[in-house]
Amino acid sequence: MALYLVIRLRGQPDRRPEEEKALELLRLHKVYHAVLVKDDPSIKGMLERTLSSAVTWGEINKETLVELLKRRGRITGNKRLTEEYLKKIGFNSFEELAEALISGKVSLEDLPGVKPVFRLRPPSGGFRGTIRRNINARGELGYRGADINNLVLRML
């Protein structure tokens, strides 16, 4: 079972109501916010049909997920996600948590106090294409597969 990372790249103006609702359901309220979602047919359909003009997504690997959790993971009170806190909720390390997330044993919503949204920065070096077009048309939007890992590492 794959775990997708979804990043919002485009802002609020001129969004259709169904796009706004889908972004709200995914908790992508601001540009450069990211969430982890399961590989589910309903989520996949929502991404492909409704949100392909506002977000980019792909399968995240374990190494990138560990870095994302270490550097951008937050708990209640806007404090960093630390190894001490992970031990309190039953995980010995970031690697163990990442493995549990990817295998589908646990989700971020199930963990007490862990915020499910990651606030990223704009990518260092900028985007390779425009954020107005799809990835297939020399843009940045839409499904990018494993290339999402390179983008996320530049946004941490």
Curated annotation (Swiss-Prot):
GO terms for biological process: maturation of LSU-rRNA from tricistronic rRNA transcript (SSU-rRNA, 5.8S rRNA, LSU-rRNA); translation. One of its GO terms (cellular component) is cytosolic large ribosomal subunit. GO terms for molecular function: RNA binding; structural constituent of ribosome. It holds the Pfam family Ribosomal_L30. Keywords: Ribonucleoprotein, Ribosomal protein. InterPro entries: Ribo_uL30_ferredoxin-like_sf, Ribosomal_uL30, Ribosomal_uL30_arc, Ribosomal_uL30_euk_arc, Ribosomal_uL30_ferredoxin-like. NCBIfam families: PRK06049.1, uL30_arch. Part of the 50S ribosomal subunit. HAMAP family: Ribosomal_uL30_A. Belongs to the universal ribosomal protein uL30 family. This is Large ribosomal subunit protein uL30. It comes from Thermofilum pendens (strain DSM 2475 / Hrk 5). The lineage of its organism: Archaea, Thermoproteota, Thermoprotei, Thermofilales, Thermofilaceae.
